Swiss-Prot record:
One of its GO terms (molecular function) is 4 iron, 4 sulfur cluster binding. Its cofactor is [4Fe-4S] cluster. Belongs to the aconitase/IPM isomerase family. LeuC type 1 subfamily. This is 3-isopropylmalate dehydratase large subunit. Pathway: Amino-acid biosynthesis; L-leucine biosynthesis; L-leucine from 3-methyl-2-oxobutanoate: step 2/4. It comes from Oenococcus oeni (strain ATCC BAA-331 / PSU-1). The gene is leuC. It comes from the Bacteria.
């Protein structure tokens, strides 16, 4: 019987349970942050339990951290959560990339960056965008706080095995079109619930030609299409990325030999297959209040089909038939676990080099980790951003979500490289428009979205 990569990894991790029912599976790595872990640790204390495998857990601080004056946390709840994580990890013997640590950053950025994320693993975190790690050929998914506690106590989790979707991505991307446009295009076409109840695997020549950071962008946003998990078969690109990282296997040759078993035998093994050609794909921009409400830059916003569309247009202050180049951009955000990596910053910097953002625009550049910030500064990216009028910040989740000081004011349209454009996501009343780093950089210069393909050419 033909099997998917997902089937093979799942089978190796099942401890007990019948097919079709919840099964107890082993967890290779749990990533922790300050927001969804406090109650989990408190639960352990109340039951007088220890962490089963401290070495299989790793924590960082990202959601609430300020990106200016990082040790001066003014919000009392945020400060308490960060202090609590520091105490909990110390008390239970878990590694922590704390405030100011050279390893600190967004949890879904530092996992791969440190070599913690590896093929064939089951990886969990109390955060929905845990699917990012599936880009390495792993099963990775977000869990709730009670499940975080269960994993801490047992290094296992109860899960019902989902069905699988294979998304065949093929063709050659045009200049100015990126991985972000692919996943936004898929969600815009298939809807925000196409993946509900499924684990997604991306495959095809377009995927094979991507670097790891592009692959992570795809898997990161598959959750916005309803899927709990997204993955990509590991290959030499994967192995080369992991080699020599801090927590990479000591014997890479042996590890690679093991990792090579994780592949899908045939597309026939998937429960469902979606075909997606990128040959004619254009840059995408979101117009509404979910990632599926997005259009190619050269197409008008759609007609109102239902009450959800009507409410979305009212919230963002736009009208059906208008185009993305009519959105008055006053705020831009470069960062997040979707597009806050070094290659993303390089792309944005190329657009901004020797240019200046439009007067009246606030532009935040927030590297996904301290290591990325240091690497960017070594090649002069910080100077390019600052000379263009942007603010160069410390690492963190920042303006992706309104849980820290970096918030978009009410009524303001923000061009953002993040992953969600829900009402109030970037701050109460904020209006978020998702796009690639190149598109956001161009919007910062012009004060509106333009077709970056024409700008580059």
């Amino acid at each position: 019987m033909k099997k998917t990569m997902f089937d093979k990894i799942w089978h190796q991790h099942v401890i007990t349970g019948e097919p079709g029912e919840p099964q107890l599976i082993y967890v290779d790595l749990q990533l922790l942050h300050e927001v969804t872990s406090p109650q989990a640790f408190e639960g352990l204390r109340e039951k007088n339990r220890q962490v089963r495998r401290p070495d299989r857990n790793f924590a960082t601080m990202d959601h609430n951290v300020p990106t200016v004056d990082i040790f001066n946390i003014k919000d009392l709840i945020s400060k308490k959560q960060i202090e609590t994580l520091a105490k909990n990890t110390k008390d239970f013997g878990i590694r922590l990339a704390g405030m100011g640590s050279k390893d600190q950053g967004i949890v879904h950025v530092i996992g791969p960056q440190l070599g913690l994320t590896q093929p064939g693993m089951v990886i969990v975190c109390g955060d929905s965008h845990t699917a990012t790690h599936g880009a390495f050929g792993s099963i990775a998914f977000g869990i709730g706080t009670s499940e975080v506690e269960h994993v801490l106590a047992t290094q296992t989790i109860w899960q019902t095995k989902p069905k699988t979707i294979g998304i065949h991505v093929h063709g050659k991307l045009s200049i100015g079109v990126y991985a972000k446009d692919i996943i936004m295009g898929i969600i815009a076409r298939e809807g925000v619930s196409f993946g509900t109840g499924y684990a997604v695997e991306f495959y095809g020549d377009t995927i094979r030609n991507m670097n790891m950071e592009e692959r992570m962008t795809l898997c990161n946003m598959v959750i916005e299409g309803g899927a709990k998990m997204g993955s990509i078969q590991p290959d030499q690109t994967t192995f080369d990325y992991i080699a020599d990282r801090k927590y990479a296997p000591g014997n890479m040759e042996k590890a690679v030999s093991y990792w090579k078993q994780f592949y899908t035998d045939s597309p026939d093994a998937f429960d469902k297959v979606i075909d997606f050609s990128v040959n004619e794909l254009a840059p995408f921009v979101s117009w509404g209040t979910n990632p599926g409400m997005a259009v190619p830059i050269d197409q008008p916003f759609p007609k109102i089909k239902n009450e959800e569309d009507k409410k979305a247009y009212e919230y963002v202050g736009l009208k059906a038939g208008e185009k993305a180049n009519q959105i008055p951009i006053k705020f831009v955000f470069f960062g997040s676990c979707t597009n806050g990596r070094l290659s993303d910053l390089i792309i944005a910097a190329k657009v901004l080099k020797n240019k200046h953002i439009k007067n009246g625009i606030t532009a935040l550049v927030v590297p996904g980790s301290r290591k990325i910030k240091e690497k960017a500064e070594k090649i002069g990216l910080d100077k390019i951003f600052k000379e263009a009028g942007c603010e160069w910040r410390e690492p963190g989740c920042s303006a992706c979500l309104g849980m820290n000081p970096d918030r978009v004011p009410a009524g303001i349209h923000c061009a953002s490289t993040s992953n969600r454009n829900f009402a109030g996501r970037q701050g109460a009343g904020s209006r978020t428009h998702l796009a690639s780093p190149a598109m956001v950089a161009a919007a910062a210069i012009h004060g509106r979205f333009i077709d970056i393909r024409k700008e580059i050419i």
